[in-house]
């Protein structure tokens, strides 16, 4: 099957493919991360949709790749599509261990692009997603508010909510407003690289997590209707955001630090804080490699790409073809933990583009595990839809 990939380092092309469902649809848009473990499995087909699964609104709280056919096979109705500038791993301390707090002020990550070019690249990415949705409007549509989500899902199409994966807004509220006008409805202050106004859990790790401008950004997001994502912010950034939040926030993709011992995952204290805002924590649905294994794989990959591709454009394109894949299952133990800590009304799921077709089995997995139908509906999407409706309008 022919596939076409898009990201901010690649201009829009005409994607055409004939799917296994016998319909012509655009196959993919977005990034394939080498830690995303994306796989397809022929076992999952539309004929196996359970009655309950079909009745639910199923939400993928964080996807780096939108594949229409795979979403349909997985029974997913709403996808939060993350995009942004590629970031590269440029420094690691000897024998670095992600369970050990990095030195304060350490810079380990950087985006491929800077300044006005970075903003332009983000605008290109938004345009690519809009073009993709327009080309396949019979199957997918961008949602800009809660009413859009309800309408699109009711029509039988997939609702796509655009998310800026890191707060690269050129230190400008005007740029934030511009991105909102173009359709961005979710934003993480920092992902891998710390921004000038917010620390990430991967580097810096210095109080305060938000500076004065960062606090202005959070307030502006609440005013214009951009849902704030704390998934990979530092503890300090999370605490500072939670201390001023007046609307629900989200963690679009995380595990639990009490289980993984990884600084990239959230502490119970932060999980409770997100719940206290009325927000939702989206558990990375699949199990997979340990954080240390991903950490070392990323470093090796980006060092090789930096050596082989001097041009950032070519390096970003090469990264797309470097996905590592392996099979995974629903991470029930982490879901149980977040339910205990934050409550059933504050738990969701996300794929990070991993094994989307397997979502068709999640309803049965959760019920067999002991959750009732009402609880399954909340976990699979009801909680995320509520938070989106309360924040983006």
Locate predicted features.
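Active-site core of metal-dependent hydrolases
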Residues: 188-191, 196-273, 282-286
